[in-house]
UniProtKB/Swiss-Prot annotation:
CDD domains: TcpC_C (cd16428), TcpC_N (cd16386). This is Uncharacterized protein YddB. It is found in: Cell membrane. The chain crosses the membrane at residues 43-63. It comes from the Bacteria. InterPro entries: TcpC, TcpC_C. Keywords: Cell membrane, Membrane, Transmembrane, Transmembrane helix. GO terms for cellular component: plasma membrane. Its main location: membrane.
Length: 354
């Protein structure tokens, strides 16, 4: 009886165990985790306002850039319309000289009579720049009241032209004579009865005094039209000769001393003999760009030859003495030559007068 109870207990235990195992095998469905949606309204608002702000900034920047570009274009137009120094320097000296030739004659020649003085004033005014406000001093600028003689132009030549901001200053070396009356005391023989006696008498004569000065004439132009912009004035003639030093290029190459040196020197001797005596057409076989003295000078000698070897041949520097064929007056000249050699024959590719 006891055994039966024990057996029934075991059966119940095994039943519960197997039921428990089956329950374990059954997968429990996972509970859905409900996500709470975030509040994105602030993020959207910030993004929208940022976009609006960016657009406003870009529009403002575009307006500023447009204004700046327009300002730069206007400046460029102004600069283009302004006359440059190059434009000012394009004054035709030849045309200006032709214009001034009549003015110089009118200005320099002065006659001591009222009709000539008035005619001179009118003529000179026709050369002047026209002023909107005609001042009294402009009307009187060529008045020569109070003169005591004449002035006569003997000759003139253009001395220099100086460019300025508003005009060009034409400087002419003028030679002229001032004629003026002088009262002198002279002795004269007069009859005194049967005898003659010397008496002193005052007479008026015209004296001449020659002068050389620089006549400075300010000139303005508009294209090929010219006008004198101010009253001319005189200055002393200055020396155009200047103390100008020229620094020559220092030669650092070694002179050629090879086996062809004597042949090159012999060629130079022959070349300059032909250069002095032959016609230009005859020099074709000796040089690329033919030139010649065609017998106007006689060849003397080649002096101080310096030869340098180059990739294409030789570069030669030399001094050559020619002379006048009528009286042997020497004429010295310096040359540089680029020489090439072909089959033992030398040829001048380039000749330069130094």
């Amino acid at each position: 009886m006891l055994n039966k109870e024990i057996g029934s207990d075991k059966k119940e235990e095994s039943f519960f165990r197997s039921a428990f195992q089956k329950l374990k095998r059954i997968e429990r469905p996972e509970k859905d985790k409900q996500k709470v949606p975030r509040d994105r309204s602030k993020l959207i608002a910030v993004t929208l306002w940022s976009c609006v702000g960016s657009l406003l900034f870009i529009c403002l920047l575009a307006v500023l850039l447009s204004i700046n570009t327009r300002s730069q274009l206007n400046d460029m137009k102004d600069e283009t319309n302004k006359p440059t120094n190059d434009d000012k320097q394009k004054i035709s000296v030849t045309a200006a000289e032709n214009f001034l030739s009549g003015f110089i004659n009118e200005y320099m020649n002065v006659k001591n009579d009222q009709e000539s003085i008035e005619k001179r004033m009118q003529s000179l005014e026709s050369y002047m720049v026209k002023q909107e406000d005609n001042h009294f001093e402009d009307e009187e600028r060529f008045n020569v009241d109070g003169l005591k003689g004449d002035r006569e132009l003997k000759g003139y030549s253009l001395y220099n032209v100086k460019e300025g901001d508003k005009n060009s200053l034409f400087q002419y070396k003028v030679t002229y004579e001032n004629l003026y009356p002088v009262e002198k005391e002279v002795e004269k023989e007069v009859k005194d009865g049967k005898k003659k006696k010397k008496v002193k008498e005052k007479v008026k004569t015209n004296e001449k005094y020659e002068k050389q000065m620089l006549l400075n004439i300010p000139v303005t132009n508009k294209g090929d039209s010219f006008a004198v912009s101010a009253v001319p004035y005189f200055t002393q003639i200055y020396d155009l000769k200047g103390d100008i030093a020229f620094k020559g290029k220092e030669e650092t190459r070694d002179e050629y001393a090879g086996e062809k040196k004597e042949s090159i020197e012999s060629f130079l001797q022959n070349f300059f003999e032909k250069y002095a005596s032959e016609k230009k057409e005859e020099m074709v076989y000796m040089m690329k760009k033919p030139e010649a003295l065609e017998g106007n000078l006689l060849f003397g000698e080649v002096q101080s030859v310096k030869i340098f070897e180059t990739k294409k041949g030789f570069e030669v520097f030399c001094a050559v003495r020619f002379k006048e064929k009528e009286n042997d007056i020497p004429v010295n000249e310096k040359f540089s030559l680029e020489i090439t050699e072909n089959s033992g024959q030398f040829y001048v590719n380039k000749l330069k007068h130094q």
